[in-house]
Amino acid sequence: MAGHDVQYGKHRTRRSFSRIKEVLDLPNLIEIQTDSFKDFLDHGLKEVFEDVLPISNFTDTMELEFVGYEIREPKYTLEEARIHDASYSAPIFVTFRLINKETGEIKTQEVFFGDFPIMTEMGTFIINGGERIIVSQLVRSPGVYFNDKVDKNGKIGYGSTVIPNRGAWLELETDSKDIAYTRIDRTRKIPFTTLVRALGFSGDDEIFDIFGDSDLVRNTIEKDIHKNPMDSRTDEALKEIYERLRPGEPKTAESSRSLLVARFFDPHRYDLAAVGRYKINKKLNIKTRLLNQTIAEPLVDAETGEILVEAGTLMTRSVIDSIAEQLDNGLNKITYIPNDSAVLTEPVELQKFKVVAPTDPDRVVTIIGNANPSDKVRTVTPADILAEMSYFLNLAEGIGRVDDIDHLGNRRIRAVGELLANQVRLGLSRMERNVRERMSVQDNEVLTPQQIINIRPVTAAIKEFFGSSQLSQFMDQHNPLSELSHKRRLSALGPGGLTRDRAGYEVRDVHYTHYGRMCPIETPEGPNIGLINNLSSYGHLNKYGFIQTPYRKVDREAGVVTNEIVWLTADEEDEFIVAQANSKLNEEGGFAEPIVMGRHQGNNQEFPSDQVDYMDVSPKQVVAVATACIPFLENDDSNRALMGANMQRQAVPLIDPKAPYVGTGMEYQAAHDSGAAVIAQHDGKVTYADADKVEVRREDGSLDVYHIQKFRRSNSGTAYNQRTLVKVGDVVEKGDFIADGPSMENGEMALGQNPIVAYMTWEGYNFEDAVIMSERLVKDDVYTSVHLEEYESETRDTKLGPEEITREIPNVGEDALRNLDEMGIIRIGAEVKEGDILVGKVTPKGEKDLSAEERLLHAIFGDKSREVRDTSLRVPHGADGVVRDVKIFTRANGDELQSGVNMLVRVYIAQKRKIKVGDKMAGRHGNKGVVSRIVPVEDMPYLPDGTPVDIMLNPLGVPSRMNIGQVMELHLGMAARNLGIHIATPVFDGASSDDLWDTVREAGMDSDAKTVLYDGRTGEPFDNRVSVGVMYMIKLHHMVDDKLHARSVGPYSMVTQQPLGGKAQFGGQRFGEMEVWALEAYGASNVLQEILTYKSDDVNGRLKAYEAITKGKPIPKPGVPESFRVLVKELQSLGLDMRVLDEDDNEVELRDLDEGEDDDVIHVDDLEKAREKAAQEAKAAFEAEGKE
């Protein structure tokens, strides 16, 4: 027997064909959400408050300090928040201290700071009753970047940018004359020496001393001449910078100093964040700068006088490591003192070394390091600026390297916590202005923190973020896999990110650093391709927001691959050689072969095994969760694998789902972490279990109660239904399944079913990917799903009186009311069809709505019956089903309703949808198709044992698409069915062809895995043997019921009077320019005329035509289309005297919208009236005939 058995949870064993021993379990798959939010509550929120506060007033006599905060219990439970359309949020109370510096008086007070949305255990937020997800954002990391560009003459120029988290950008660039310039915040450029002089190093000699002698420095100094001898060089430089930043304003050295301090050195205005400081120190650190350079002077320890490194030594990684301690402690540190008129007068510490120029062995180049400012320094420092300039000047000498902005060492993730912290900071900084003003205006004696703090800007910022940010998305809840995928999504779009139109190919492309960090397969098709990605299965964020991936450490000395796990970011990994997870190991755990395949900085090549530093932990660390659920992924073309991964996320939960016979072993983990199942929180024993709740008695005697959700509507309108898995007496451990969620079976993801599939053509019905299906799948509810839709009706106060929910509806027969209760609301369990009343509602009708006759009757009889009009909630088209639930909210019951609303009724209708012609089906390999024919079971081809085939697919769909994985799955699936087992074939480590054929033989199938098939209609065998097997097929959310649409009379657009478009608006079909050409080409003038008039926007014409049709009279001639009138009016509004003339040159009067009664906009109601009027006239005529 090939393979070995693996237990997944307590309910499933699979035969696995994996050969690689897993040394590391998958991390919790939604930790990117939950960990980030937890960190925000524990540290992030406090940091934001400490950043903005304390706040002083303008005279510095009062100060408001932050003391601490407390988050209390949420107002609603999760379930209540869902039902009441409320947010699941907790009140936050912040303690402030107000200090009066004149009197020394201190007032401490706790202030309510609004309700803060709280993340659920599943990693989601409930905002206004809807479940939402904050998608993590992929952005460029703050730091310093160097780039090169080739001009039109083929000359290479260099550039550099310091990008902060917030604040002004500082750029350097060279021009064609080899002069180096700087730009501050995208303004006009100035020679870079001007900025150096402004920092207090004004003499040319000083500049040469710092940077060394090079063409760039020399050319720039020649350009930067002393224009005004009255000013010192520093003052002149400061004025020149001020002129660039504030053109047209009077320039003084003092104002320029304060402006530069505010731009770059004020922590309130300029922030690198922890990650920016880390990246700058890493880039401008002397250890990075010296790597692989030849030192030009001996390095001497200042304290001991010992020569550490001789001149002429190549500074390899090992040499640098040997003197790392001395380098960190300030080896070759030089302190420069700026002059007194500099922007900052503090001494500047740099580390300075001389190396041999790689391009010219006789030249010596000066290298400067920024002497590692502390992690606490969150602004840029003069040392950073000088070290950046040095790196920039060295690029021209061939020292240092330019950055690749698509490298994942330069792109980081802003997860929920950080996005929220930024939003709160925004709100607090708006509040800060407000607080300052109130402190200054009001009387100091009686002020309390409560009086000066206005929390509205903060609550508004949070509300705005959750409600309308591009990154706050309505959760994709088609099935648990789509939930999980959505929580792990990484978007490069959003505020501070890219825009679709500006993103080029490079940023969308797969980069070698994506390996183990971002999935190269799972990304949407269409305009967002490559901008929206998914975290790989083992991907994890470090404290700076860079994605790490785990590797096994290789002990080079012992020649053994250890089980020690090291998590590396992309730029750390660049220094090492990493072997693949499928490298063969011997008994001792060393590499079995002297040469192994490995990766180093984007090169995949063979390396001697004694040079390897790390090894992958698992073959599936490359791909995301949805991709890791595709068996035989290694045999599929990547384009089709992308479709397969994306389509699994669109699978509809079925009534009785089945886990795949051929899985990958990922199904258990995906279901477990998705949040859709009920998982045991503690060990214990089940004491009670039914369909609605499970009780577990813990060992310490306390009781855990788990509530099971039944048929709740998901965000996508599918049924969110959980099924209890345990029974009384079962012992459960923490992490065990208590109940399956939707699309799960026995604790595994089960998106579809395992039908018997044959690759064969049948009467041409599976042309172009169409799917032929047996009627068994319809009758046995194999692909039946339940869909829930929610409809609501509310009563409001109107000017003419309140609306009312009632059974007394005018002009409605008793038959239409048979399912309504005494209040006029539909009963639960009623079967409803299109047009049935769900909630009877009447609205008061003003006098102006009545016709002349009605007004007369009203005056005579005081007839009250006509005072209301029917505004009942009815079943829209295509929404037939069974009433599953009704919820009623009223002010009397204390429900929170919008202002002006007295009562709200929600009706949930469940539809049971069987599979039908037009529905979309798919496999897991991107093999999708539409059901074209449902064939009776007796006509389907059958196997020699009499089993009819369930589905027939077109064999032509396989070769050109190169997704051979489906054929492998087909054969292995048939073997699994015959053997009665489930199989796991993990990605890139699954069943080989030998394993496949061994299993096929073990199952007693023919050696080619094909079979003779018999035609169900004639009983004759088909000419050739056919590949028949079991393939996992899913039904997708694109169902024909949602797309079918037809209109006869419906709503019209206000301006053009043409029918609206789209199913949602009950619109018509667009008859566009090209369609008009087609009718013109056939000379079908009458057809064309009626399409452009009656059927579109000839308002009078369509009414008269309707009347003519109902009365059986000839249809009158059409009039002028409304859009022609709109055109004429538009031209008149431009001041053109536009008139319409007939053939005798007489002016034709076009109707005006505000003339006469005929010109009212015709709505469906008016057509109804016309219908009633015609019926009454017909009745009168009939009675008159009878009398005669």
UniProtKB/Swiss-Prot annotation:
The organism named in the record is: Streptococcus gordonii (strain Challis / ATCC 35105 / BCRC 15272 / CH1 / DL1 / V288)
- NCBIfam families this protein is in? PRK00405.1, rpoB
So what does this thing catalyse?
RNA(n) + a ribonucleoside 5'-triphosphate = RNA(n+1) + diphosphate
One Pfam family recorded for the sequence? RNA_pol_Rpb2_7
The protein's matches in Gene3D superfamilies, at most eight in alphabetical order, are given as: 2.40.50.100, 2.40.50.150, 3.90.1100.10, DNA-directed RNA polymerase, subunit 2, domain 6 (2.40.270.10), RNA polymerase alpha subunit dimerisation domain (3.90.1800.10), RNA polymerase Rpb2, domain 2 (3.90.1110.10)
Record has ATP-binding as a keyword: no
Q: What is this protein called?
A: DNA-directed RNA polymerase subunit beta
What is the recorded function of this protein according to its Swiss-Prot or TrEMBL entry?
DNA-dependent RNA polymerase catalyzes the transcription of DNA into RNA using the four ribonucleoside triphosphates as substrates.
